[in-house]
Amino acid sequence: MTEDNAEGQETALSSQNLVSVEITLPKDVSGASKPLTVKMAESDTISDLTSTLGLLSSMRDLTNYYVFYRNTNISETFDELCPISEVISALRVESQPNVKLELRHKPYTLAAVYEHLNKFREVIGLHFIDRRAFELGELSGVGKFDQLQLSQVPDQKEDEKEKVDLGEDDKASISSICDRILDETKLDLSEYGKFYDIYSDLQVPIKSLTISQWSPVSPKEAVRGDLLYLTLQTLENDTYHITCHLSGFFVNSCSTVNFNPARKPSHEPKFLFFDLVSSLSPAFAKTIARNEEILANSSRYAESYLIPSHTSGSYPWLVDTSAISRKPDQSRPQLSILNNGVDGSDNVKDWNEDFQAIRELPSGTVNERILRERLAIKLVSEFTKQATETAVNIIKGNLTPMNPNESVEQHIYMRNGIFYSSGVNATGAFDETGGNEAARYAAAKDLAGVKLLNRIDAKGIYHLATCVVDYMGRRIVCQAPVPGILNDPIVESDEAPADKVCYGLSTDGTKVYSDSQFHEALKPIAEAFHMKPHKVTLPNGFKTKEDIALSKDSKGIRGTDGRNYVIDLYRSTPLDIDFIEKHWRPEHSDSYPHRETVLRHEAVEEWWRRRALAIFKSETERLEAEQGAKKNEGESEKPQILLDAQKVSFNPDAFTHDEVDEEDKEVVREMSLFVTKQLIEEFVEESKKQLCPFDGSHLSSLLHKAGINLRYLGLIATRAQESLEAFEQEEKSKIEDNEKAIEEEKKEEKTEKKEEKEEKADEEKSENEEDKTKPEEPSKGVFDPIKANLNSVRLLAIQEMIARAVKHIFRSFAHTLSSYLLPYFVAHFHNCLLGSQVSSKPEISIDETLTAFADPDALRFITLDHQQVVSMVEEEVLLRFRFELPENWINAVSPITMMREISHKFGIQWKTQGYAFTAEGFKEFQQSTENIIVHKQKSSKKSKKRSSPSVEEVFKRKTIFVADDIISFTPSVKSSSYKATLLDEIFEAARGKIAAEEKDSGVTLLNELVSIYEQIYGVVHPETSNFYSVLSQFYSDLGFTTEASEVARKACVLFERTAGFDSFETISSYINSAYFEAANSSYVNAFKLYEKALGDWDFVFGSHHPSSVTTLTNLAEILAQLKITDKANRLFSAALELSEKINGEDSQITAMIHYRFAGTLVNENRFDEALGHFEKAHTTFSRHIDPNDRLTKDCSNYVANLKTYIAYMKQQAKDKNKPKKVKAPPVPPQATTKKSKNKSKMAQTQISKLHLNSSTRFSSSSRVKPRLKKK
């Protein structure tokens, strides 16, 4: 974004004129005695005003009203999208402090009653309970943040001292946290999977509310104003029949068997349904108040329980069944009546028309862009939700296809304006490139192209709302179809139907169409994708006369609405030809599954950037040389550089069996090699010093951002191993060179005379005293956990390959399994894969009532055993990732970690319990899960009066997993939702202001941005979470420690709910939040957050994550500063033990921990132990860095001085304990005491300096710096 644009965004946001609007409520509304006052921008619309009013507590029940200015009905006179400024101008509102408006009751219609009843359900809290009832899994959006019970963030005052004295209670709390951190037996899944679900504590304030059996209203009563009849049962068990009238609500005289719509005089009518129920049930208002109190007390952050508006919550892979609660509600099955409108058509949407209409909205001003982006994100969210629910029903077999006579994979559906297909090779387009596997891959790449088009926002060309749903092993592609594409054209019997494709490859694949209107509209997209206009020659000899902008496989279709649509964007990046030529051999059994392997958009963008930069640099040098020659000749014209787009673009149809220029092929080959030769090499190199990924999802995310496809996971693992071996060899050579240098120094020291040594020491002392003012030379040590990082990346890559291979195996079995047999298969497969220590041939028992409906071929999984499953995984990994798993790989991976990874990949929710994977642990697990089933024996008719005898049967599991352990399967949804470009522009403007030292303006923009994020995405959304994380970092850098802590806490809550309670985003946010809490001197809070992060690491990765070493060491130093020395020493010891395990005992990082630990021990006057650690550090530093490095010299000095000091103290103690003699010979003072006292004094001086000399830190910080996602 240019500087002018940045200034424009700031001006647009800061210069909005605010209008104070005073609202007078109807007299019968609670709180109507005082007018309401709200602040609105002049650019806000009437719709914005009504939305704002709906958020006010006093307006929460009022849904049906007119807005009046004096006697002018604004609601009827002006459009709801009319800006307030136009209303003020049109009505000639007098200039006064407030614009005075009045709300008046509007007569109800049946549609308004439906809306009012829906609002009533929301007000009394039923929407919380409805959300749980209609979820596609269990306990979505739960978290653990509130379980930490953090104290309130203190206000940090400027004059507050940095030193904080903790009370004994706080020290005891921190000590107990440290004990839990150091507890090696803390891996307990039965506790790890427990959550507090706020909604489970809420009580329904009424017993039931249903549409009465007397509905619909008869024409006779409708004439009198009756709209609907309801039946209400209160908590007092009283039943009321209620009439919804145009004037409001009242109790009628109906009963269950008699119809009498007359009003009961004993009950007053009310305009608001809430007021009527409150008058009928005293417990109603009390229950609502109690529910509100529960929500308020459960968390200080409303983000913990607010319902996500534009996204879905994350489903946990572990589910505590005790937290699952079901609240009865007879009106819930009738919600479709209320939501679908009077004629049932409100839920039927023309998604495509709505989507395109929003894209056509004006976007000239900031407010217009905010409105447009908000509506677009909202619509995409609603589309994805609707599509996901329908896709799940399709997979479960609940819906009838349009083509029921074809195979299941070929079935297509058209439901509620959305077209559904199975993402298979239905048209035969991928017959030669992999069939169904290629079609499945292409569906995901098409979606990636749609997401990019959403951001590009090209004019004159349209694309489709799209999402992809994976559920129980099947994929459903959901799209809002092009208008008219499903209509069959009317043709004569002897004529072929007209092709609906106007641009690109024809439906039958025999020709390529061109169209000037499409071509011009597609040019901006081609430029954004860096595609080269090109001609196409098909294998059948057909040649295009004109260039086409995109790949020939991307089709242009003109809809019946007159809009031009582009579809099939799966080839918007070039083929990965290097990978294809090496691994696509369809005639071989070990061939890669398909040939549709394309590069990622991130890789193309990076290739384009580097190539353009190289061309620009070359041209600059050439023009500068020419300019220099012209200056000599007297010419001074400034050169201009124009970048030829042809030099930095590619032909997307290269290597697609079409005839293409060799030059175009070479460019695509260069791009393919760019990934393997540069991006992967750079990724492995950066992995040495960057924060190591936390889990497979984190690794996958990093690879995608780097432009690396996951098919290269095998190459990543291989290169990590090779890089590790090279590093170890380099270290070995360095050690040999340093050891030679040490030996040479020792020889030189032996040849020196004692007098020369003392003279040299005096000279060095004087030199040191002279050089005190000189800056200290930094150490050459490298304290990145290179060995641990490379090992971890390799392990994570292998784990990710295994988990993804298992997902593909599940998918292959799921095609023949019904939904009710899938839990048995998944549980059995897990027993075979992870339970070999319990049984290599696990048993499986399936209910006969289920097997009776199953195809015998579908039950082939029953015979699987451990060795077969291991072989299947090895073959799948080799097939998809070109990597041979090492021997005994199953023993190298953590069962819990693998169970979690597979659960995330396939969408499995397991019952929370202490799964055990060893023979010893399984025996305890068996006992803890024993169930006693009571069977009652049948009694004869003669003995009916006698009680039937019962028989107890003990169910004892024989395997780790059983089908009942699977709580649910959840869908994995790939949406076309995107990051609004406006937000990036405002953020860059704010960052520019801060960088330019305009702190106040920058912070104001950031605060405005918080509001805009919540407007566009809603409060509970991954993008909002990410921005909170970035904002907390900015606040911290600006010195706003209190604000940083508050915002970081919200980021933790939101990431837990949207990304997962143990996702890498959540763990990172906890680490950052802990850092900010410590910076704010809230050490108890910081340690609670660190404990949660470290605990998650243990489950997600294992206790040996490279960053755990840094975290433990930093915590130890914090404890040392807080004078909690015993726990500090234990954490230092734990960090040392872990570092020796993952970095090596003889490594720079381990030596640095010795160095820091020694400094802490000196502070505790534990000189003997400190000496031992300094000696170890000195040995390692001299061997790995340099004998003359600053750290090596420092350690040498500390060792020498500590030895001298310890010897002196021992001598002092010895002299003190000597018995006094009567006579002592006179001793010359200078002959015996001066030298020893000087040495002791020097040693004490050096030791006192050591207290301040433990500031060297690892370059790989345990704190994760949040960054905005690259798009």
Curated annotation (Swiss-Prot):
Repeat (TPR) residue spans along the chain: 104-138, 502-535, 1067-1100, 1109-1142, 1151-1184
InterPro entries (alphabetical): CLU-central, CLU_dom, CLU_N, CLU_prot, GSKIP_dom_sf, TPR-like_helical_dom_sf
Clu domain sequence ranges: 329-580
Main location: cytoplasm
Molecular function GO labels: mRNA binding
Comp. bias regions, Basic and acidic residues: 729-763
Biased composition (Polar residues): 1241-1253
Keyword line: Cytoplasm, Repeat, TPR repeat
Official protein name in the record: Clustered mitochondria protein homolog
Organism of this sequence: Meyerozyma guilliermondii (strain ATCC 6260 / CBS 566 / DSM 6381 / JCM 1539 / NBRC 10279 / NRRL Y-324) (Yeast)
Taxonomy of the source species: Eukaryota, Fungi, Dikarya, Ascomycota, Saccharomycotina
The gene coding this protein: CLU1
